[in-house]
Amino acid sequence: MADTTATLRDRREAVVREHMESENRHDFDATIATFARPRYEIVPTGDVYDGEEAVRAYFAASRAAFPDQRNEVKSIRHADDAVIAEFDLLGTHLGPLRALPPTGRAFRCRMSAHFIFEGDALVCERVYFDQLTIMRQLGLAHETTSLAGRATMLLSHPLTIGRAVARRVRR
């Protein structure tokens, strides 16, 4: 049984490594081929891309925003039904990101992806990361204690800030 488990883990890890390397090469045909059925779940945003057409649209949109997007694998771990990859994602914001115009700024963010398997068939990549890390590096978010952060908060939430100031004055 140990040999079978080791062999299954080896096959799964080879799939994950090819998956991540093909993303770096922007060889999305090869990336799609690593799945039994393509599915990405981007946990911080709540986005789910289910099926080849949806996954290809995700690749197109994310690489339009970050044409040099790539990953650097830091570690790989195994679970009963998954391979978990810890990696840095890097890229430069050179195209539109949803409604946000390009900033020209680069980012690096530590992420974790759970590659879910049924046997040796990859059925889902579920990605976890801190959105704020990326947004700060792109200049799209600020520390709330900084001058830029306070100004942004005041402009974005004038009623909330006004009420907080009024409560403080009444004390």
Residue ranges and their predicted role:
Residues 2-171:
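C-terminal and inter-domain tail/linker signature
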